[in-house]
Amino acid sequence: MGWSCLVTGAGGLLGQRIVRLLVEEKELKEIRALDKAFRPELREEFSKLQNRTKLTVLEGDILDEPFLKRACQDVSVVIHTACIIDVFGVTHRESIMNVNVKGTQLLLEACVQASVPVFIYTSSIEVAGPNSYKEIIQNGHEEEPLENTWPTPYPYSKKLAEKAVLAANGWNLKNGDTLYTCALRPTYIYGEGGPFLSASINEALNNNGILSSVGKFSTVNPVYVGNVAWAHILALRALRDPKKAPSVRGQFYYISDDTPHQSYDNLNYILSKEFGLRLDSRWSLPLTLMYWIGFLLEVVSFLLSPIYSYQPPFNRHTVTLSNSVFTFSYKKAQRDLAYKPLYSWEEAKQKTVEWVGSLVDRHKETLKSKTQ
């Protein structure tokens, strides 16, 4: 008996990787790839995958209820990756809460109406923190009662959405069956197409090859995008397996891999040093001072808000996020989902470095065309 899967956010960094892996799954009769918009080159890539499995591209809004109901019709599994990721406070709070929280709630309701039995949610490490750069979390695990206390819209919205997904586990579906859910909390995701890495590299290329310091004092365990996608495949397999499902239903899992624990600055450097990019060697402000400057910038932004929208370069949340010791173990995912990274650190590094090389080449071409 064939089954079908809807992937929301399928045009994003993670969503498209999940789609590529889904094509390999047995007895999968249809993949529905949903997003607000798809780049032409991704549409072309998806059309090539049609030879393997029926792949339907759906463009629409996560807040459009009739659209979601149509998208969920006759679907066996929903993988919900769609969200607004915003750690710098660029996007309006209401937009983030609408897409990340209300959109998730509407999708859960659409699953009930369409009797979709399996729902997998892409959560975030930020649901757990960090709340203070002074608090050290090393090899954190699911049994620790960690919860983000920042009012910042992105982590707050992901926390509420994850709670909604896990609370929906056990809901009755329209056809009398039961909805089963789980959530995956990846650590910082890097890899080809990564928006934060891309921004850092492009900024350095326009700054004499000097990488700006984003997190000199941090120790984190970044995770390769291909391994996060693989964890989603294993989660759907587990929730569809009567033997494995009971221990996975209603659970959340930290997803990391064997990428070495390091600072954000060091990761950016390792992935770009062969192209001559280097770390900023200038003296940097002490962390405590950075934190309180961040607070002052927030106050200025708030006071100016009635007349002017001032976007501070950093705030207390970004200082904390970028400079904490915050690492997590994937042992629970290993135990319940049989998760083992699909890509080693060496493979992940090689693939990402090749992609960074393409950014460097593109920059050179741009410079060449400007001088002609």
UniProtKB/Swiss-Prot annotation:
SUPFAM superfamilies: NAD(P)-binding Rossmann-fold domains. Changing residue 222 to H: In AH2; nonsalt-wasting form; activity abolished. Changing residue 259 to M: In AH2; activity abolished. One of its GO terms (biological process) is steroid biosynthetic process. It is found in: Endoplasmic reticulum membrane; Mitochondrion membrane. It is a single-pass membrane protein. The keyword Oxidoreductase applies. This is 3 beta-hydroxysteroid dehydrogenase/Delta 5-->4-isomerase type 2. It comes from Homo sapiens. The gene is HSD3B2.
